Amino acid sequence: MNSKFIVIEGLEGAGKTTARDTVVAVLRAQGINDIVFTREPGGTPLAEKLRDLIKQGIDGEVLTDKAEVLMLYAARVQLVENVIKPALARGSWVVGDRHDLSSQAYQGGGRGIDSQLMASLRDTVLGEFRPDLTLYLDLPPAVGLARARARGELDRIEQESLAFFERTRARYLELAASDASIKTIDASQPIEQVSASISQALAQWLTNQEPV
């Protein structure tokens, strides 16, 4: 079948790394071995520099919400145009750790940036480019943040309030409910059950794709 762009989304501590491993295992079982991995923000030299600024800040300067979202879209368009689109064009599959849905949820939901502005930014920067499938790993923010804290020091965004992540989750769920290409996975389950749910959702989706 033709190359596809699959994205894994979720709050901090949702288990995106484990989900990626599961996705790769399912794809390889289907004979799909040419896989490119991406992360957002990041994935190109410029985008990685922006990632550091977004996550850590610089010299204590306050990063405004609109500056943050513009930096995210600058990093995203670099990744899409320089990595993702070329990979898809040469027949590779792309598995991404976050994409535009993160901005719609974190900046649109968590930060409260106007949803029309967020949609306009997406459409202006990305045009009609969208993932073929998004796996959204859903879990209560308190659970995810506890997992993130257990990993070590939190970055600038991970230090946001629980209310911020509650708003972010609510926007994720709202967007997932209105888009058939987004599959919601209960990430509060034990890891084995989460992997099984991902495998089932991905396998079912693959059976509905047109062969080459």
UniProtKB/Swiss-Prot annotation:
Matching SUPFAM superfamilies: P-loop containing nucleoside triphosphate hydrolases (SSF52540)
Domain of life: Bacteria
Binding site for ATP: G10, L11, E12, G13, A14, G15, K16, T17
Catalytic activity from the UniProt record: dTMP + ATP = dTDP + ADP
HAMAP family (UniProt xref): Thymidylate_kinase (MF_00165)
Family: Belongs to the thymidylate kinase family.
Protein name: Thymidylate kinase
Organism: Yersinia pseudotuberculosis serotype O:3 (strain YPIII)
Gene name per UniProt: tmk
